[in-house]
Regions:
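Structured, active/binding-site neighborhoods that engage oxygen-rich ligands
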Residues: 116-492
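An interfacial alpha-helical scaffold signature
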Residues: 1-121
């Protein structure tokens, strides 16, 4: 006796025509849905099975693999799924029936059950007044500001990293560093931030094509490409699991990246270990006991990966743990990414810090990072910034002190350009602290508040602008489907 059909199999039987091909359709069937973004407050999700059934004046819909839609259903939980609305044979399913079917469908197609990023969206209406959902573009002035000001801070400190203030005063005068150097080149901080951003874009492409994907694994591959730029032959940098004969993607084609700008030995040795063994480090399987700032200084783009700050914290901490195994190394990265996440969404710094600390104190071994944050806030409340107060927070070479200096500098003044100079004028790892401060104040104030001459001169400004535009396009209802795009951002 044949079993009864599930609601999802009814859908496939009615509109795909072959119930016995359920697993096949799970992997290869495509439906049209409103944009890629599905919100938690969707009550009725409209789905079309082919373009011929859609109203002629609807333009903002995307074709997605069926399993991608189902992976979203598990998280967004609409009350009803409406198939081919307005058509002679339209169908509605109650989600109380669909929930189990969607989860089962994900298992059949091997998608796993990790919720993918829920991307913020807004309502649009077609000519007939029907409402549907598309991705809302973020305030790109904030994202451009975040990444550009981060590069500026990096360049401000590039030539004076770990030099005593006495030497900085000898070179730059009694006020210390007050302007970009004549050749405002970035260091490994911005290099790795760009490869992180590339990983986020490529991960998004992968999710769009294939369903939920592991951002940390995609980022590991990106960092192996960065390792190749640091004079490591590709056959030794690519990793034991890779079969690529050459590194792929658009970012790696920029030859100016192939310069050793004081790369952190902790990062390079951890990446070399992965290349040798193929074993990815994690919080539960640390590669070392380092709490260096190299884990935190690169994670600003992880703020783009999810709407949930708790998820952003987890993703950033996992990112940092690829190379830095001490809790203060990866927890400071989690805090930093959540700060950027909140600032990009228009929150003030105190409110952003409250959200970040709430995420932090849920984790084990958070005490050292909490103490560093509290110290930074206390000093900022005193006003009157000084080198002595910056150096009271530490040298910035480890994650918690780098975070503290960046945070102090952003809190103690409302001028983002002054904040950058405060964060770079100390005798420690000042390119990293200024880069992190730049990420914060750029996200807080937007690129329009950053000195225009600095914005124009800093290295890789054109690359940052292009990648921000590409991120916007990848998140739009018109996300590219041409092979050229997948060559630019391979889904891996």
């Amino acid at each position: 006796m044949s079993r009864p059909l599930t609601p999802m199999e009814h859908l496939l039987a009615k509109y795909e025509g072959d119930v016995n091909g359920f697993g096949h359709h799970a992997a290869h069937g495509e439906l049209l849905v409103p944009g890629e973004s599905l919100l938690t407050d969707v009550e009725v999700l409209d789905v079309y099975t082919d373009e011929s059934r859609m109203p002629a004046d609807v333009e903002q819909w995307n074709r997605l693999p069926l399993h991608t839609i189902l992976s979203r259903l598990v998280k967004i939980s609409p009350q009803r799924l409406h198939v081919n609305p307005g058509q002679p044979f339209d169908t509605e399913f109650d989600f109380t029936e669909l929930g189990d079917a969607a989860a089962q469908h994900m298992r059949i197609c091997g998608c796993g059950e990790r919720p993918s990023a829920t991307r913020e969206a807004r309502r649009w209406a077609d000519a007939a007044g029907r409402r549907f959902f598309v991705v809302r573009h973020k305030d790109n002035a904030r994202l451009r500001g975040c990444l550009t000001a981060g590069a500026i801070g990096d360049a401000l400190g590039a030539n004076t990293e770990n030099l005593p203030m006495e030497v900085i005063h000898e070179r730059h005068g009694p006020d210390g560093i007050t302007d970009l150097p004549e050749k405002p080149d970035i260091t490994d901080d911005t290099q790795m931030t760009l490869f992180t951003f590339e990983a986020v874009i490529r991960w998004h492409v992968l999710e769009r094509l294939s369903g939920p994907a592991d951002l940390t694994a995609v980022t590991q591959n990106a960092y192996q490409r960065w390792l190749h730029t640091q004079k490591t032959p590709w056959e030794k940098a690519r990793g034991a699991l890779s079969t690529l004969e050459e590194p792929d993607g658009w970012l790696i084609t920029h030859r100016d990246l192939f310069r050793m700008r004081a790369p952190g030995l902790t990062c390079t040795s951890a990446l070399q270990e992965f290349a040798r063994t193929g074993e990815q480090a994690s919080i539960t399987k640390p590669v070392n006991n380092s709490k260096g700032c190299g884990g935190a200084m690169r994670v600003a783009p992880v703020a783009l990966a999810d709407e949930d700050p708790q998820m952003v914290f987890a993703l950033a901490a996992a990112n940092a743990a690829l190379t830095h195994g001490h809790p203060s190394g990866y927890l400071s990265a989690g805090v930093f990414a959540v700060l950027v996440h909140q600032l990009l969404r228009g929150k003030g710094l105190p409110e952003a810090l409250e959200v970040a600390v709430d995420s932090l104190v849920r984790r084990e071994d958070h005490e050292e990072v909490v103490a560093a944050i509290e110290h930074a806030v206390e000093l900022a409340a005193l006003g009157e910034p000084s080198v002595a107060r910056v150096e009271e927070l530490g040298r910035g070479g480890v994650g918690d002190t780098a975070l503290a200096i960046a945070l102090y500098s952003a809190l103690v003044t409302d001028d983002p350009n002054e904040a950058l100079l405060i964060s770079v004028n100390h005798g420690g790892d000042n390119d990293s602290t200024a880069s992190m401060c730049g990420n914060l104040v750029g996200a807080l104030h937007g690129i329009g508040k950053i000195r225009p001459d600095w914005v124009e001169r800093v290295q890789f400004r054109d690359v940052i602008d292009r990648m921000v535009s590409d991120w916007e396009l990848e998140n739009s209802p018109a996300a590219p489907v041409a092979q050229e795009w997948f060559t630019r951002y391979p889904p891996s």
